[in-house]
Curated annotation (Swiss-Prot):
GO biological process: translation
Record protein name field: Small ribosomal subunit protein uS15
GO (cellular component) term, any one: nucleolus
Pfam families: Ribosomal_S13_N, Ribosomal_S15
Sequence similarity: Belongs to the universal ribosomal protein uS15 family.
Single GO molecular function: small ribosomal subunit rRNA binding
Annotated keywords: Ribonucleoprotein, Ribosomal protein
Keyword Ribosomal protein recorded: yes
Keyword Repeat (UniProt): no
Family matches, as CDD domains: Ribosomal_S15p_S13e
Length: 151
């Protein structure tokens, strides 16, 4: 899928493994994988970071095939899921960083423009998550309280 505010076409993507069965050489069972997920989530890692660690350190290509569920669903069942979705969280974090930069460099017009683009992406994504009932309907992004969300 193409980028929203950039000229890139975004053709590159990772390929999913063809076989959906669990590899025979994998020593971890479904319960072991879930325990690893819980342990890493309690350390404060995001679901994508957990997936990368499971892939690189433990050889779990797709958690869904081994454990029977996606990482975020496993975390939701245990009550360890993040309050706001990961992609929205990182957009808010980026907006806070740009605002902090603009406090020091008031004349930076390009950063001011990029902040507008990032915040429009935040509003669009928040609207999507409200319709999917991931966020509460009264949730609103405000730049004044944004730094408290990502701290």
């Amino acid at each position: 899928m193409g980028r929203m505010h950039a000229p890139g076409k975004g053709i590159s993507q990772s390929a999913l493994p063809y076989r959906r069965s669990v590899p025979t050489w994998l020593k971890l069972g479904p319960d072991d994988v879930k325990e690893q997920i819980y342990k890493l989530a309690k350390k404060g890692l995001t679901p994508s970071q957990i997936g990368v660690i499971l892939r690189d350190s433990h050889g779990v290509a797709q958690t869904r095939h081994v454990a029977g569920n996606k990482i975020l669903r496993i975390l939701k069942a245990k009550g360890l899921a993040p309050t706001i979705p990961e992609d929205l969280y990182f957009l808010i974090k980026k907006a806070v960083a740009i605002r902090k930069h603009l406090e020091r460099n008031r004349k930076d017009k390009d950063s001011k423009f990029r902040l507008i683009l990032v915040e429009s992406r935040i509003h669009r994504l928040a609207r999507y998550y409200k319709t999917r009932k991931v966020l509460p309907p009264v949730w609103k992004y405000e730049s004044a309280t944004a730094s408290a969300l990502v701290a």
